[in-house]
Amino acid sequence: MQDKYNHLDVERSAQTHWNAADAYRVTEDASRKKYYACSMLPYPSGKLHMGHVRNYTINDMLSRYLRMKGYNVLMPMGWDAFGLPAENAALKNGVPPAQWTYDNIAYMKKQMQAMGLAVDWSREIATCDPSYYKWNQWLFLKMLEKGIAYRKTQVVNWDPVDQTVLANEQVIDGKGWRTGATVEKREIPGYYLKITDYAEELLGSVQHKLPGWPERVKLMQENWIGKSEGVRFAFLHDIKDASGALIGDGQMYVFTTRADTIMGVTFCAVAPEHPLAVHAAASNPALAAFVEECKSGGTTEAELATQEKKGQPTGLFVTHPLTGDKVEVWVGNYVLMSYGDGAVMGVPAHDERDFEFAKKYGLPIKQVTDVKGQAYSLDAWADWYGDKQHGIAINSGKYDGLAFKAAVDAIAADLAALGLGEKKTTWRLRDWGVSRQRYWGTPIPIIHCDEHGAVPVPEKDLPVVLPMDCIPDGSGNPLHKHEGFHAGVVCPVCGKPARRETDTMDTFVDSSWYFMRYCDPKNSEAMVAGGADYWMPMDQYIGGIEHAILHLLYARFWTKVMRDLGLVKVDEPFTKLLTQGMVLNHIYSRRTDKGGKEYFWPHDVEHVLDDTGKIAGARLKNAVGDLPVGTAIDYEGVGTMSKSKNNGVDPQDIIEKYGADTARLYTMFTAPPEATLEWNDAGVEGSYRFLRRVWNFGVKLNAMNSGANGADAACAKGLFDKETKALRLEVHTLLKQVDYDYQRMQYNTVVSGGMKLLNALEDFKGEISAASLAALREGFSVLLRCLYPAAPHLTHALWSELGYAAEAGDLLDTPWPEVDASALQQDEIELMLQINGKLRGSVTVPAGADKAVIEAAALASEAFVKQAAGAPAKKVIVVPGRLVNIVV
């Protein structure tokens, strides 16, 4: 056994052993309890970052612990391999996205293996492999058959540089998230999935079927689905288009959740794309210019809520359905055509957005709800405008005096009687547009025929294989001009020459079901089969909070579609969800002469502290470029590790210098899994020192071990002296706590428990005998098993070197240690001793002592005799198991 801990040798040896044993390959076994634990599959960007290390270590600790607990554990890994970054890399480096992607996969896989992850690599998938995306295409065709997938033309966000559609979430301040180009509104055809058909179930399941999910994530999904109950009704008009036909059949529909305020309408606003806006703009240059301006504005509800409210009158009027009053129509930049009917009623007295708009343009404000008798006031308005729980209708004619619900019911009934409205439930959720004008994605299995239009590719011809030799040049989708992609393509209906669909699928499609493919990854005959019946639903899913809405919602929807098609039996894919915290580091920068920012690596910087020891600034401790040592720079606090801010830490550097076990241990010990982790180099050093202490104690114990390998046989009650019993009490007390912390996935306290356990072993001062050596060996075996999920390489080596493997087998499959109840039984207990309520010492009594024995021991104690100074005890209060208080 080596005297000094050499992490390189230890980790290389352990990984060689595991690989030779094919240690992590798992098969379905109906006789065993299963547990499926999975981290969200990574995008193969090139290198792992510390966020990856933290995520995968959380999963690995859970998997190893449960395997020791007897579970049949599946921990798979794969690659979310399609996406725009590969195309951007191709543009930059002149290599096909496929080559860039597979090179990155190979490198990142080596990094993961160096971490010692218990991954079953036989189940590895890459979403860019035709054997995987074939099933994207197959299910898409099934959705077409069932009417879940459909084609339509819709106004979309168009990035003119990337030549692609952007989701609302990818438009930031009117610009493309990647290119920064001003986003345009365009009408183009594309394929959509009817996720809205599942809105009610998706919402209901969030509320009732996901108890193992964080409340924060569930609330985010509820808000995204956005169920609203209200009234949809029409304003009448006689506005005609150029052909003389009434626009919208003479009706302009709106939806409101506040029908009780309908009598307070003083204007209406429509989206720039609304037919009335388009009609009015045709003869109004100022309005036409405003409509064009709106195209570069925000496209999400969040952006519209914060941007300045702007409008332009159309010169058109509609008729109020209940009063007959004429209501002016405006175009508003805060109205979305994609939500509701693209028009809203303006009730500035009782809606914050309408109020802001009306104040800006001097529009009338009419109060129609009285709240707690308060007089209407522009100053006090914001405090009560939305109080619908206590409002009473006023200035509303026949509805005066009605409370909110009664007013809504009465108004809805009157609108229905007129044939102009009805109660309705609406949803914020919109159908999922899956068409992308990009190359590196799953080809949509459609053939376009001049005679028969869009025709599905026959199942026998799947997969439609993506050409692997394309190198995007920035001029749009290269599939348009790739001759091989279209060569020999004929219409499945008539057999005439045709062309393939060149749009590819949104990459969220790839990640919406990959976790099911892990269950049966090599099956060429079925998308999923018996493996999914065994492993699904997933027991624990681990990933970042940034995926709370889109990925998790789409995965839930995809699962329900697969269930309805008879492919799986589960309603929800993920039983429990853990969203791990981000890894943060210090950020240092300075303004450049050109007004930009230059960021500095933390290893080049030292802090400047104020009188209280707080960070007041920073300066260079190493020369950087032309900047000398001592140059003052700005300290921006801590933030997420980022390449752009030079505050990332390369896991490879940590693994090479300290070892994978140190990287794993540090990321687990520093903060609970759900909390953010602030990087600290000193903490990494501390984790390494702890592992070195564990190794050193193993060396010491190995030297003490003179053939006393029968630890379990020697550990029998009655063979131990007082010090040894105290050691065993501490060992099994800590084991009980660590086991509980593993069950709660509180891995920071798991590691701290291991540290306390090592302290107890190191601090043992008893006489070394066969019995005490057996107790030390028992304690160290408990420590190794407790630390094994966090530091598998070191514990594997020590387990073997100290002879535990010869007794109990490979640590990988050694059962979790059992708490010895007899070790927790104490012969004596120590009670706090108080005199007149103040702590003065302690008293030791037999564990089963009654009150009389405890009182006698307390009164005879040295502490009482000294403090009482001869004064008699007036009263003795005993709190069993805790303290004795003597009143004198």
From Swiss-Prot:
<dbReference type="InterPro" id="IPR025709">
    <property type="entry name" value="Leu_tRNA-synth_edit"/>
</dbReference>
<keyword id="KW-0547">Nucleotide-binding</keyword>
<keyword id="KW-0067">ATP-binding</keyword>
<keyword id="KW-0436">Ligase</keyword>
<dbReference type="Pfam" id="PF13603">
    <property type="entry name" value="tRNA-synt_1_2"/>
</dbReference>
<dbReference type="GO" id="GO:0006429">
    <property type="term" value="P:leucyl-tRNA aminoacylation"/>
</dbReference>
<dbReference type="InterPro" id="IPR009080">
    <property type="entry name" value="tRNAsynth_Ia_anticodon-bd"/>
</dbReference>
<dbReference type="GO" id="GO:0004823">
    <property type="term" value="F:leucine-tRNA ligase activity"/>
</dbReference>
<dbReference type="InterPro" id="IPR013155">
    <property type="entry name" value="M/V/L/I-tRNA-synth_anticd-bd"/>
</dbReference>
<dbReference type="GO" id="GO:0005829">
    <property type="term" value="C:cytosol"/>
</dbReference>
<protein>
    <recommendedName>
        <fullName>Leucine--tRNA ligase</fullName>
        <ecNumber>6.1.1.4</ecNumber>
    </recommendedName>
</protein>
<dbReference type="InterPro" id="IPR009008">
    <property type="entry name" value="Val/Leu/Ile-tRNA-synth_edit"/>
</dbReference>
<dbReference type="GO" id="GO:0005524">
    <property type="term" value="F:ATP binding"/>
</dbReference>
<dbReference type="Pfam" id="PF00133">
    <property type="entry name" value="tRNA-synt_1"/>
</dbReference>
<feature type="binding site">
    <location>
        <position position="643"/>
    </location>
    <ligand>
        <name>ATP</name>
    </ligand>
</feature>
<keyword id="KW-0030">Aminoacyl-tRNA synthetase</keyword>
<keyword id="KW-0648">Protein biosynthesis</keyword>
<feature type="short sequence motif" description="'KMSKS' region">
    <location>
        <begin position="640"/>
        <end position="644"/>
    </location>
</feature>
<dbReference type="Pfam" id="PF08264">
    <property type="entry name" value="Anticodon_1"/>
</dbReference>
<dbReference type="Pfam" id="PF09334">
    <property type="entry name" value="tRNA-synt_1g"/>
</dbReference>
<dbReference type="InterPro" id="IPR001412">
    <property type="entry name" value="aa-tRNA-synth_I_CS"/>
</dbReference>
<dbReference type="GO" id="GO:0002161">
    <property type="term" value="F:aminoacyl-tRNA deacylase activity"/>
</dbReference>
<feature type="short sequence motif" description="'HIGH' region">
    <location>
        <begin position="42"/>
        <end position="52"/>
    </location>
</feature>
<dbReference type="InterPro" id="IPR002302">
    <property type="entry name" value="Leu-tRNA-ligase"/>
</dbReference>
<keyword id="KW-0963">Cytoplasm</keyword>
<comment type="similarity">
    <text>Belongs to the class-I aminoacyl-tRNA synthetase family.</text>
</comment>
<dbReference type="InterPro" id="IPR002300">
    <property type="entry name" value="aa-tRNA-synth_Ia"/>
</dbReference>
<dbReference type="InterPro" id="IPR015413">
    <property type="entry name" value="Methionyl/Leucyl_tRNA_Synth"/>
</dbReference>
<dbReference type="InterPro" id="IPR014729">
    <property type="entry name" value="Rossmann-like_a/b/a_fold"/>
</dbReference>
